[in-house]
Amino acid sequence: MDIKLVYSTLDPVGVTIKKLGYRFEEINEDVTDFHYENGEAIVIFSRHESKAGIPSLTVHYPGNPSEEIMGGEPKKLGIAYPRLLTSILREIKKIDLNIEKTMEATHHGPTYQNVPVIFVEVGSNETYWTNDTIVKALVDSTIRSIDKVDEIDCEYYISGFGGPHYSRLFTKLADESCIGHVISKHYIDKLDDKVIIQTITNSVNTINKVVIDSLNSKQKERIIASLKKLNNINIEFR
């Protein structure tokens, strides 16, 4: 598969990558609203921001689960590629740096692409975005992960609902299974049937399991009602 590695010249992590001498695809757009669509899959490196400023390496898919948008379109998810994201996450976990490595729930744009997009990010402030050692370790691990996409084991292909934005559960499940879209608890009450279905259908690999994390009975019932429209989906509650 033709997987394109991309950075933006408007992003500080992209600037660091360019300074380090990597020759990837270069865009001059906001990473949350870019229109680049070459190749069969896109991995875009970018900064991750958080008020806590905790150093972190994160991966996630783009998508806006509700009417609220940050780039892209409302109520539209990008295309997931569970094998690729999981391969990247597993390699990131091997990086020998005292830094948090985690999967984030699906959020922000872009949502225009007809190919999968995966964000690989450095957090959480300029100290880390411009740190050559951290950025190089992340980029090199991502390059290694691409060579392993077709080799990794996936017990299940999982989509998820619930839990916090930084998901320890799905980060852990990625040790054995491959992870698609994860919708955090913050969006659950804003979901409509269309978005719930997209968590299953918008995926390169066929999703065969849904994990529901710490939701109340009313929220579970609504998700299950939507999922019943699809066949052969195993549902697990945590």
Swiss-Prot record:
A GO MF label: zinc ion binding
E.C. no: 3.1.1.96
Cofactor note: Binds 2 Zn(2+) ions per subunit.
Disulphide bridges, residue numbers: none
The entry's keywords: Hydrolase, Metal-binding, Zinc
Gene3D superfamilies documented for this protein: AF0625-like
Swiss-Prot/TrEMBL catalytic activity: a D-aminoacyl-tRNA + H2O = a tRNA + a D-alpha-amino acid + H(+); glycyl-tRNA(Ala) + H2O = tRNA(Ala) + glycine + H(+); D-tyrosyl-tRNA(Tyr) + H2O = D-tyrosine + tRNA(Tyr)
Signal peptide range in chain numbering: none
GO biological-process terms attached to the record: D-amino acid catabolic process
Cofactor(s) named in the record: Zn(2+)
Subunit text: Monomer.
Family: Belongs to the DtdA deacylase family.
NCBIfam families on file: PRK03995.1-1 (NF003070)
Role description: D-aminoacyl-tRNA deacylase with broad substrate specificity. By recycling D-aminoacyl-tRNA to D-amino acids and free tRNA molecules, this enzyme counteracts the toxicity associated with the formation of D-aminoacyl-tRNA entities in vivo. Catalyzes the hydrolysis of D-tyrosyl-tRNA(Tyr).
Protein name according to UniProt: D-aminoacyl-tRNA deacylase
